[in-house]
């Protein structure tokens, strides 16, 4: 019989890899979950996501509770204590069990000599919890965001930054996209009801359904047969502006993992779609999504800055550019973003977006539509990016989304329960 793994130590090591090594939790967590029993998968995910969501608070508390930070080979213990604090603050796990399992985690990370230290710090927190939390709630750390990002949000949204931060710190709802080639949304909602679950239609996006309670995908009616796809409502909004038509040649650039590629084909099943992404590994998910939905598209690996390398001189009727960005609009869904991103990344990403826009524009037919989209809330990547593009591109015209002075449509996190997202619809004169 396989020895029971210590979930607390696994969570601590995963968070350490995110914060100290810059690895994405999306890459780290799935292989870890394969190592634990089905009943423990959800708890492992909760511990990892929860610690990353509240990292500022947990770090602040440790600095108050310990005279010196844990460094070097003992650094993992710092994150193990974070996991312990998170359980005491945010879970229903009985405190004695949370303490015992966290202390035992020291053995799993080969630091058994520090069991007493871990136990002492966590018990000290229990004794001082009320006064520590009162002090924390009066500090800037209470916003649970790195200071550089907080400053950018305050500058860009002087009236709204607090609501953005609050939305980022919430657990996200689960949004689905009903495949209209199989069922109407109303029909699928009836099937969902028959399966004992409840969903709510989005007022503006015709395929979007929000589950009352998140559920595993295998429990959703027809998921394996392509009847429904997990996709946030704001991401589904891209199709409102792209408006793909049958018979058109359409490019989905920066396409992985393929959610928007398949949405194009649901709306326009007879469109000729080319899906391109620079990341060959992530392209495998585009193939997986196409296969599950029984769809066909031309899938290519390529760099958006050099389109002639993968499409020659070909032009398209419509282009969806879901540009690489800071992902500051989806922090509630991916809390590791707060700790993976740095302030210096923003101008670098804006430059990359600018290069891709300039490179792909000649591949749009005259009269064609390009939708520029990001899951960012930062103006440098969004309205300012499009404003600069319009100023230097004589044959580009903004359509339906904003004004030349304030181009694009910005959805903020939590608005209509969707992610933060930006769209700009451009027409080639």
Curated annotation (Swiss-Prot):
Enzyme Commission (EC) number: 2.1.1.176
GO BP, one annotated term: regulation of DNA-templated transcription
Coiled-coil segments on the chain, per record: none
InterPro entries, per the entry: MeTrfase_RsmB-F_NOP2_cat, MeTrfase_RsmB-F_NOP2_dom, NusB-like_sf, NusB_RsmB_TIM44, RCMT, rRNA_ssu_MeTfrase_B, rRNA_ssu_MeTfrase_B_ent, RsmB-like_ferredoxin
Membrane-spanning residues: none
Reactions the enzyme catalyzes: cytidine(967) in 16S rRNA + S-adenosyl-L-methionine = 5-methylcytidine(967) in 16S rRNA + S-adenosyl-L-homocysteine + H(+)
MF (Gene Ontology): RNA binding; rRNA (cytosine-C5-)-methyltransferase activity
A Pfam family assignment: NusB
Keywords on record: Cytoplasm, Methyltransferase, RNA-binding, rRNA processing, S-adenosyl-L-methionine, Transferase
GO (cellular component) term, any one: cytosol
Residues where S-adenosyl-L-methionine binds: 254-260, 277, 303, 322
Cellular location(s): Cytoplasm
Active site (UniProt): 375 (nucleophile)
Family, as annotated: Belongs to the class I-like SAM-binding methyltransferase superfamily. RsmB/NOP family.
Biological role stated in the UniProt entry: Specifically methylates the cytosine at position 967 (m5C967) of 16S rRNA.
PANTHER family attached to this UniProt entry: NOL1_NOP2_SUN FAMILY PROTEIN _ ANTITERMINATION NUSB DOMAIN-CONTAINING PROTEIN, NOP2 YEAST -RELATED NOL1/NOP2/FMU SUN DOMAIN-CONTAINING
Protein name: Ribosomal RNA small subunit methyltransferase B
Protein's organism: Escherichia coli (strain SMS-3-5 / SECEC)
